[in-house]
Regions:
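Transmembrane beta-barrel domains of outer membrane proteins
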Residues: 66-70, 104-106, 189-191, 203, ...
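Predominantly transmembrane beta-strands of Gram-negative outer membrane beta-barrel pores used
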Residues: 1, 17-18, 54, 62-88, ...
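One face of beta-strands
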Residues: 117, 356-360
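Short Gly/Pro-enriched turn/cap motifs at secondary-structure boundaries
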Residues: 54-58, 312-313
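Surface-exposed loop/interface segments of Gram-negative outer-membrane beta-barrel transport/assembly proteins
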Residues: 1-47, 83, 87-185, 201-318, ...
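Transmembrane beta-strand segments that form the barrel wall of outer-membrane beta-barrel proteins
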Residues: 82-86, 334-343, 385
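Short glycine/threonine-rich loop-to-helix capping motif typified by GTGT followed
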Residues: 348-352
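Alpha-helical support elements that line or immediately flank enzyme active sites
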Residues: 62, 186-192, 206-208
Length: 415
């Protein structure tokens, strides 16, 4: 047999009778015995497919209602949706409920004035076992579990072998996460056709994200084959409350003028400004050592074992931009651009940068001699020069000098 060593170099781990039980995939259990590194544990022979015992098939349901209509000067669309998704674990809970609202409308307020609205809202509520995301990786724990380890002892309690947590018990009894999120985006746009060829466009986009997460991590008791409690794991128990909110704003205003003169001269001029900003805040409160685990509200935890921390940041980019484009006879093109960007990532005295650009093009393919040759359907020669800024890799507050705190010195610099 492949599992049998007969040259005397090792002490046999299994007898011939035990190897036969393995071959038969027997569910027979032998009492505690000396069997190598697992001395003191019962001896098992039946192979267990832990992946199959723990992981099932997810389920997803989708419901949608759509309404649309309009008239001569307006149009609208409304979409409502609900999605319920059940995760793949067979133990514990993993249910995610999501709700959607999508709305679009366009209204011609006056003959030359149009307002467009695009709204999107999504809310979700997910309840799932904290064993999926908190503490030890549950998939690593499944991998470490011996394939012949039973899930339950004869008393029907989750069985623990070799000191490793039972993955099913972690999912079922290890605690819960309740995560609620809300995400809304409102996009407003106003277009005014002032005169022939000239329009003003204003756009305001607001995005708001909120998250409220309640996390409990519970102690679990390990039981041996005789249903004796042998140890407590995942201690101390704990509860956390996490809040997060993000508010993003993007405002743009620009004028765009396009005019053709005598069918040979095309002029396009655009000038505008924009503002983009984001505010982020996050707060977490935690308590540990709860006397009971039925209700793990924060106020019921130990006041001596509590932590609270927060973080937040804010950034802004303001810009001015302009572009002038002139085309003659649809063959000769020259264009100039310039923009100024001010970023909050830089010191106030060095916050702004100016970035010009120019390019020229010759559509050789439109020349009569090139058309007669018939070599190319389209051929363009182009040359350009431009400057651009880059703030990637620069932290939000890198320009601010750090302050060192000490118990013995004034907290300024390194002195």
């Amino acid at each position: 047999m492949a599992l049998e060593i007969t040259d005397g170099s090792f002490t046999p781990e299994y007898t011939r009778d035990q190897l036969e039980l393995i071959r038969q995939n027997s569910d027979q259990v032998l009492p505690d015995a000396e069997w190598g590194r697992w001395t003191g544990y019962p001896q098992f022979f039946k192979d267990q497919d832990w992946n199959d015992m723990l992981i099932g098939n997810g389920n997803m349901q989708n419901y949608n209602v759509n309404i649309s209509g309009g008239g001569e000067r307006y149009s609208y669309m409304l979409s409502l949706g609900h999605q319920r998704e059940e995760g793949i674990p067979k133990f514990g809970e993993d249910v995610n409920k999501r709700y959607f609202i999508r709305a679009k409308s366009s209204v011609e307020i006056f003959k030359n004035l149009t307002y467009d609205l695009n709204l999107a809202y999504e809310a979700s509520n997910r309840d799932y076992s904290s064993g999926l995301t908190e503490g030890q990786n549950i998939w690593e724990l499944i991998y470490k579990t011996r394939s012949w380890t039973p899930m339950y002892n004869p008393s029907g309690t989750f069985y623990t072998f070799e000191g490793f947590d039972n993955p099913a018990q972690v999912l079922e009894d290890g605690g819960m996460v309740n995560k609620t999120t809300g995400n809304i985006t409102v996009n407003n746009q106003l277009r005014w056709k002032v005169i022939d060829g000239l329009q003003l466009v204003g756009q305001a986009v607001i995005r708001k994200y909120d998250m409220d997460e309640n996390v409990t991590n519970k102690k679990i008791t390990n039981y041996d084959w005789d249903n004796n409690a042998v140890r407590e794991k995942r201690t101390p128990n704990s509860a956390e409350r996490r809040y997060q909110k993000t508010l993003s704003k993007n405002f743009t205003l620009y004028a765009d003028y396009k005019k053709n003169f005598n069918d040979r001269h095309d002029l396009s001029v655009m000038v505008g400004t924009s503002h983009e900003s984001e505010n982020y805040d996050r707060f977490t409160a935690k308590r540990i050592n709860f006397d009971q685990q039925e209700n793990m509200s924060l106020q019921l935890g130990s006041a001596q074992d509590q932590n609270a921390w927060s973080e937040g940041n804010q950034w802004t980019i303001n810009s001015f931009f302009s572009r002038v484009n002139y085309t003659f006879a649809n063959k000769y093109v020259i264009e100039g651009t310039i923009r100024a960007d001010g970023s909050s990532r830089f010191d106030p005295d060095h916050r702004w940068g100016w970035f010009p650009g120019v390019n020229a093009a010759w559509r050789v393919g439109e020349e009569g001699f090139m058309k007669r040759l018939g070599w190319f359907e389209d051929l363009k020669v182009r040359a350009s020069y431009g400057e651009m800024g880059n703030q990637s890799g620069i932290g939000l507050y890198d320009y601010i000098q750090l302050i060192s705190l000490s118990n013995d010195y004034y907290p300024f610099g390194a002195g």
